[in-house]
Amino acid sequence: GRDFPGWRAGKARRQKQVWQNQFPCSFYALRRTLEPNQKCSLFEMYGYVEERADLVQYCREPIGPQLFADAFREARVLTDTIGKRVETHTANPIFDAYCSYTYLDNCLRGGFPLLLGGKQVFYAFSRKHGDLERDYNYFTVKPEYYSQGNGNFRDINQNRRCDVSLSPFVGRSNIDLFFDLLQLDGYNPLQIEPETFVLAQEEQSALAQDCPVIHGLSGVLSSGFSAGQLWRALERNAASPKERELTFAKIIAAAKKQIHASFGEGYWSDHWSYDLDLIEDYLTVWPDREEKLLCDETLTWYPARAGITERCARYRETPNGLRQYNATYPLENSTAGTVEVDAQGNPLRSCLMEKLVLLCAIKYATLDAYAMGIEMEGGKPGWYDALNGLPGLFGSSMAESCELARLLEYTISALERLPHPFAMHREIRALVDELS
């Protein structure tokens, strides 16, 4: 065959190699003349290692066609195993395969739920939908065990809406996560970052009595660590696979999970509408736990990094007519912690019922001048990115109004079912009274 113009395989291999790329692919050069009916298989291998010693160890293994065949088989087993959660058997095998594939796609965005240490609900694989044609959806996935990527609030939320039905052990964990990220203004941060864990010093000391290997993990346990970082450290320090698994489970079970999020850009008008789906799915499995779910004061509030600009400051008269710009502005506490605090510095806690009442009140207050659609006052539309210019044109959405009707219907019916009153912060009560 012909070489690339001006190049030959041997010459290409002698050039300075580029070891980095934005995409998971690379080029290899090979010069081969094929006779009729002959074929040539080219196996390409590229990847990443944390340390050179890992690469040296890996290269000691035989590298050949069998290695790639085994890797392909392992990948198929992994995807088939994930799909087992929704294994379906009907008269239509195409539908059966569709169910498994759809669940696999959900897991690539919402994550695959695991129970670590018999206690901690953990989602592996979650990330943005970073298709090659959507380079604006930048995401990263850490090259480690139990890898997680950064994902948008909506992407993760909408792909976990059936997880209680499919994986009952997740319990109320997603309800807690997404309602903890609710702000007092009814909005939420855009981006959810990979989770980390923190193990208190007293817990470390207690665990070290039964797991001496913990003494060698001080570098990892001294601050927030990921599940993958912990497993990697145990690979280097644990004497046996059994000791590694036992220590990992005990540390994760005793650790406290840390949630990380960032404001991103603007506030989407429909992110909150997925929250009710989480509640409905949970109550489908455990309808007898509704009162406890709604009334336990275990939820916190996420501190807003940006506020909504007043109307008088965001309305503009332009040659093309009235417009709405600069929807948000940074708040002074934009670098504060991950939970709102009261006057004494204690975390501000609420029950789910109070959060639902606030959400109903705020979204009702943002109905447009015709009391039909919910305004896009946060500077962003709903899920359809092509409508990004609509907020500047005083856009509002009827779809979110329908979601508000759903939320009001459930909240009112739940209030009627509760056998006793629940506490509300006076500021939230004042807002509700003013709107009523």
Where is each model-derived feature located?
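Acidic, mature catalytic/reactive cores of soluble proteins
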Residues: 1-436
